[in-house]
């Protein structure tokens, strides 16, 4: 059965050639990213436990996680958290299987704690955080759709939704993404442990000049005073400056913690390395898209991919799929830019979307007619192998934020 894949040329100025470009990334310690990370870790933990016990991933969506900021008194040399961060786990998951109670809450809380321990180094999970699981039983309608999908080799979409992907990344997009990855990388943390995980990078390109504004939570116990704090800021800027040389020849201006006012004693220091300790709240889906970026110059889906089940929820699967299709087209065909939009219809096989729209800006001297069939084939092959995405998710080969 032929798939509904439409390839067309669009006329627009590629983002790399536009006068103004905005790009954002919220690092893994940002409250919104913490919510995403916990939601996704719970979904993966539930999926693995369902598979272990029943041989199938049962219905769940754990994409409703709220991080409610606590209260802390940071100070150079080491402060304290006086009110813990409250994390609400919500969503739905099958809890009763053949009259046997499945330990949804235990699995979820364990996954959340393990995620925090692994990713937020200075957070004391037992004392700085309260985790409350309110995950409920799945919707009858959605569960029936999910169960019906078990009888088919290709799962049925449990929602009418769309996913969006684009490629290639611009220099600014790469720089913003790689900046956060560098600063939150294992090597950098060993060299400069004072840098917390709550790192937000905002990129602005005006013509051929890029401004990078970096908000980096500094861990108070790792710096003795203002002098050492300012030295840490300088080292951050120096590291990013070196990174930028490998990505772009454009002029890059780097600004770190611009709200600081040393004369007034104002510095961005934290006890735990995340602003969630001090009243900054977080929610799933309010941060990065599945490619790890927030890109107002591009098409984007508002779907929260983190925490959605990896079997039939197209809000997750189609966003990942669209990104993969776009990447492959950009790597192999003569295009300046490619945008992929995939729309499902609830209850229909996920490999048969209502439409897979592929919009391309051909490189100069090329026409879409030259490679229309090739673009179609790339999308068609990915759709034919769509269940690979579930496997990649459970093997932790894909990040969704």
Swiss-Prot record:
Catalysed reactions listed for this entry: L-methionine + ATP + H2O = S-adenosyl-L-methionine + phosphate + diphosphate
Enzyme class: transferase
One Pfam assignment: AdoMet_Synthase
Top-level division of the source organism's lineage: Archaea
GO biological process terms held by the UniProt record: one-carbon metabolic process; S-adenosylmethionine biosynthetic process
Alphabetized InterPro entries for the sequence: AdoMet_synthase_2_family (IPR027790), AdoMet_synthase_3 (IPR042544), S-AdoMet_synthetase_arc (IPR002795)
EC annotation from Swiss-Prot or TrEMBL: 2.5.1.6
Binding site for ATP: 136-141
Keywords: ATP-binding, Magnesium, Nucleotide-binding, One-carbon metabolism, Transferase
Gene3D superfamilies documented for this protein: 3.30.300.10, S-adenosylmethionine synthetase, C-terminal domain
Ranges in a coiled coil: none
Positions of disulphide bridges: none
Family named by the database record: Belongs to the AdoMet synthase 2 family.
Name assigned to this protein: S-adenosylmethionine synthase
Lineage: Archaea, Methanobacteriati, Methanobacteriota, Thermococci, Thermococcales
